Amino acid sequence: MSTFYTVISWLAIFGYWLLIASVTLRILMKRRAVPSAMAWLLIIYILPLVGIIAYLSFGELHLGKRRAERARTMWPSTARWLADLRSCRSIFATHNSEVAAPLFQLCERRQGIAGVKGNQLQLLTSTDDTLNALIRDIELAHTSIEMMFYIWQPGGLADRVAEAMMAAARRGIRCRLMLDSAGSVAFFRSPYPAMMREAGIEVVEALQVNLLRVFLRRMDLRQHRKVVLIDNFIAYTGSMNLVDPRYFKQDAGVGQWIDVMARMEGPVATTMGIYYAFDWEMETGKRILPPEPICNILPFEKESGHTIQVIASGPGFPEELIHQSLLTAVYSARQQLVMTTPYFVPSDDLLHAICTAAQRGVDVSIIVPKKNDSMMVGWASRAFFTEMLAAGVKIYQFEGGLLHTKSVLVDGQLSLVGTVNLDMRSLWLNFEITLVIDDDGFGSDLACVQEDYIARSSLLDPLEWLKRPLWQRVVERLFYFFSPLL
């Protein structure tokens, strides 16, 4: 009997180390950043079973077999649609400013579609203004309303949006709504899904959280886009979720969330529509490509207006494009670079680009919230401050609430606005969308918004920063080590 238990013990030990060795080899064979690989290996060696389960659940980009198969079958029809759209030469920009040209060229070559011109663009900086404008557009819709958000939180003006959308569906407008399962959990537990479906709205719960399928698809892969499309002509996107900040996360201790949204009219709505259709088919299997363009009757064939490129990122989209785009924008800066983000955990390449910009004489400012709703990200962000301050980067800590705006402004001309945070999750994992605008008028509007943020912020003093307590430095470095996983 003792021999039997001895054999079992040795087999268990052998299996234990074989499992660790197998996962280690799997991590090493994957083409991933060295800091990320090292962080995962450390977790596995310190807490083997917990680390292995965590890695198999969250360490690799599993889209899921069903969605991956749909992504493969969707591309031919999408490619044909893009080819048809490219035949409408009058809507595409052929020239860009010097600072914007490299980024527009990158996006066109990687996505297969150029930036579109002739768009009317409005920057909305107030939640009330955004939601009231959205309600008006819904009430005036003629044919279709399509929405996608990470979070829809019932309460306040968000309820008025829901009521307007249900009224539109009842009068015959085709309405679709896609919300992330994890982000909009409060919505899906409310009466609204049933009420909306009864009114005729197609409601889809994207990337459903199912613990039984945890090893088949990453549960932390989220649909983070915020998109509204109306009549294939009006479009919204930006950092704002479908929430009224007076009712949202009031107990988080960070104040009201501060966001911006862009409202657009023109051909950019058509290009955004193809990405909405991609996400819808990925989730439901139903093909809803926008109407094929008929060039001679497009209502927005005109030379005036803003030139906009749309970047869609996430599984199934051009790999690393948003990361490449940010690097291209930073390296294009010659005079000034201003970036706002709620979560700052950059890649080594992006951090190096930002510091290099400051060291070559560019006026570089980063605006982040002083109080963050994510303790881990807040501490990890601080770990990058010393290097940036030493390089000459100005770091502003916003004190007027949780600054949730994601924006980049280069030389007052090139603007990036959308859903992408400057952290690993947005850069490498989640479904995101970003607008690239080549226009000094819009750049001036964005600069005014950023200057208002700076006026409500405190500038971090490099000398005072070096005097912070030792325990804070230790905590920062601890979270910095795990920053590739945040």
UniProtKB/Swiss-Prot annotation:
Compartments, record wording: Cell inner membrane
InterPro entries (UniProt xref): Cardiolipin_synthase, CL_synthase_A, CLS_N, PLD-like_dom, PLipase_D/transphosphatidylase
Record domain PLD phosphodiesterase: where: 219-246, 399-426
Enzymatic reactions: 2 a 1,2-diacyl-sn-glycero-3-phospho-(1'-sn-glycerol) = a cardiolipin + glycerol
Keyword field: Cell inner membrane, Cell membrane, Lipid biosynthesis, Lipid metabolism, Membrane, Phospholipid biosynthesis, Phospholipid metabolism, Repeat, Transferase, Transmembrane, Transmembrane helix
Active site: H224, K226, D231, H404, K406, D411
UniProt enzyme class: transferase
Topology term for the membrane: Multi-pass membrane protein
Keyword Lipid metabolism among UniProt keywords: yes
Transmembrane segments: 3-23, 38-58
Record GO cellular component, one term: plasma membrane
Domain of life: Bacteria
Enzyme Commission no: 2.7.8.-
One of the protein's GO biological processes: cardiolipin biosynthetic process
SMART domains for the chain: PLDc
Main location class: membrane
UniProt GO MF annotations: cardiolipin synthase activity
Protein family membership: Belongs to the phospholipase D family. Cardiolipin synthase subfamily. ClsA sub-subfamily.
Function: Catalyzes the reversible phosphatidyl group transfer from one phosphatidylglycerol molecule to another to form cardiolipin (CL) (diphosphatidylglycerol) and glycerol.
HAMAP family: Cardiolipin_synth_ClsA
Name of the protein in question: Cardiolipin synthase A
Annotated source species: Edwardsiella ictaluri (strain 93-146)
Lineage start: Bacteria, Pseudomonadati, Pseudomonadota, Gammaproteobacteria, Enterobacterales
